[in-house]
Curated annotation (Swiss-Prot):
GO terms for cellular component: apoplast. This is Germin-like protein 9-1. May play a role in plant defense. Probably has no oxalate oxidase activity even if the active site is conserved. Mn(2+) binds at residues 100, 102, 107, 148. The lineage of its organism: Eukaryota, Viridiplantae, Streptophyta, Embryophyta, Tracheophyta. The keyword rRNA-binding does not apply.
Length: 247
């Protein structure tokens, strides 16, 4: 009976842990309708605070390259706490958005000028790759944290798309840059990729180290600090519960 009771309580603790972790994975909740940056006078807030005009005008880069213009909290402070952000993408002919992940958000992409080849990797199904050639008006969802890519395989046509994210700071981790531009020891890369030093050197050649992101304002830092706090509290609860019910 004691073991059954402990098992039931342990199951309850695990379920509670799952709920806490699920809540911590999203953007931190805010207690107001919107967040005013610490360097902004609330009495001066007007419609301009909720307006962002650079998504399209800032997206007229080199048509032979991939150009990504973001509207995240870093560019559009009014998004803090709103769990949403946006990006405009212009794919020159033959350009690719390399395999990458967004650790904090799902992505919903809509093509406004196609075609555009997209794909994602399902690690839970032995690395199955799902691809689709999208035409103008088509949409595609990339679940949070899954490796995905976009490729304009046309020879003379520019492709354009917009992406919505379920976080004000979705984050982007480019796999080529993370592996070959981050300073990981060459021996580790050699052994991990089952290749040789010459191949690793060649792969590193075009991967410059990622630029550090600017430090966010104090309001952003305070909100972002909620997430680590939740993890710390969760771990403490877990250890405490395990100790209590074991002994």
């Amino acid at each position: 009976m004691m073991m059954s009771s402990r098992s039931s309580v342990s199951l309850g603790v695990l379920l509670l842990l799952a709920v806490i972790l699920s809540a911590g994975a999203a953007d931190p909740d805010i207690l107001t309708d919107f967040v005013v940056p610490s360097d902004t006078d609330p009495s001066g807030i007007d419609g301009a605070f909720f307006t962002y005009k650079n998504l399209v005008t800032g997206n007229s880069g080199d048509p032979a390259k991939l150009t990504v213009t973001k509207a995240t909290h870093a560019e559009f402070p009014a998004l803090l706490g709103q769990s949403v952000s946006y990006a405009a993408l212009v794919f020159g002919a033959g350009t690719v958005n390399p395999p990458h992940i967004h650790p904090r958000a799902s992505e919903l992409l809509v093509v406004v000028q196609g075609p555009l080849l997209v794909g994602l990797v399902d690690a839970a199904r032995n690395g199955t790759v799902y691809t689709q050639t999208l035409q103008t008006g088509d949409m595609f969802v990339f679940p949070k944290g899954m490796v995905h890519f976009q490729f304009n395989n046309g020879t003379d046509v520019v492709a354009r798309a917009f992406s919505a994210f379920g976080s004000a700071t979705p984050g982007t981790i480019s796999l080529p840059a993370a592996l070959f531009g981050s300073g990981i020891d060459d021996t580790i890369l050699d052994k991990s990729m089952h290749t040789d030093q010459a191949t690793v050197d060649q792969l590193k050649q075009d991967q410059a180290p990622p630029s550090p992101r600017p430090s966010p304002g104090s309001s952003s830092s305070a909100a972002a600090a909620l997430l680590p706090s939740r993890w710390a509290i969760t771990l403490l609860l877990c250890f405490a519960a395990s100790y209590y019910f074991y002994f």
